[in-house]
A protein has these predicted regions:
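Positively charged n-region of N-terminal signal peptides that target proteins for export
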Residues: 1-3
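Alpha-helical solenoid scaffolds in large eukaryotic transport, assembly, and signaling factors
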Residues: 34-141
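Eukaryotic acidic, Ser/Thr-rich intrinsically disordered low-complexity regions
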Residues: 26-35
Length: 222
């Protein structure tokens, strides 16, 4: 409970999202943490930082959004750092970031990407109740169906690619043996809705196509 308090207080406070880097941190300290593979023995300090890094998912600087925030969450979750209550708190904070306007187009796709890591933790070592898992399936499907910003890579700000990140989330859920047929079909329907979306714009710049040969980088499934 003591460890969860900083996150719980934040979730119950203002809906406005804070700036990035988080309070008490700067780019140099975050890069140093990355070099240390995001190791933080102090669970309270780690959870306070996790709270702040949620806001970095909306930052237009890819070195903060993708290189620090996403990588930190991925490292912590793949190492089994968070317990079930902490994962619930993180999940709910990410859900909040799927709501409302997203003028920059980064917050929602990167919240979905980190939610794919949350879904993976439940696939590897189940902790969600059936109702929670069903709720996440619906959240993921709704997110995928809602994407209308088809921008991919943009020089200076990096990747958005909401469809790819939503697909990562759907994939981790679909790989979970706890899902039933109806839930799998719900995800399939959501994916199919984007196979030929109502409106679309090019997702990659010419430079990105030339340098990478594809629109979206592959994310780890394991």
């Amino acid at each position: 409970m003591r460890i969860l308090l900083p996150l719980a207080l934040w979730l119950s406070s203002s809906c406005a999202f804070a700036a990035c880097p988080p309070a008490g941190r700067d780019r140099a300290s975050l890069q140093a943490l990355k070099a240390a593979k995001f190791a933080m023995p102090d669970a309270i300090a780690r959870n306070v930082l996790a709270e702040g890094l949620l806001d970095c998912l909306a930052d237009p600087d890819p070195s903060l959004r993708d290189g620090i925030a996403y990588e930190a969450f991925g490292a912590w979750m793949r190492a089994g750092t968070f317990d079930a209550d902490e994962l619930r708190t993180l999940r709910d904070g990410l859900y909040a970031r799927l709501d409302g306007d997203d003028p920059g187009g980064f917050r929602k796709p990167f919240a979905a990407l980190v939610l794919s890591e949350v879904a993976r933790t439940d696939r590897v070592a189940p902790w969600m109740r059936a109702g929670e898992r069903a709720g996440m399936v619906e959240r993921a499907a709704t997110f995928l169906e809602s994407v209308r910003d088809y921008r991919g890579y943009e020089n200076g700000v990096g990747w958005r690619h909401g469809i790819a990140h939503g697909a990562d989330w759907a994939m981790q859920l679909a790989l979970n043996p706890a899902l039933d047929r109806a839930q799998l079909e719900r995800l399939l329907t959501a994916v199919a809705s984007q196979a030929w979306p109502p409106t679309a714009t090019p997702t990659c710049s010419a430079k990105a196509n030339a340098s990478r040969g594809r629109c979206c980088p592959w994310r780890s499934v394991a």
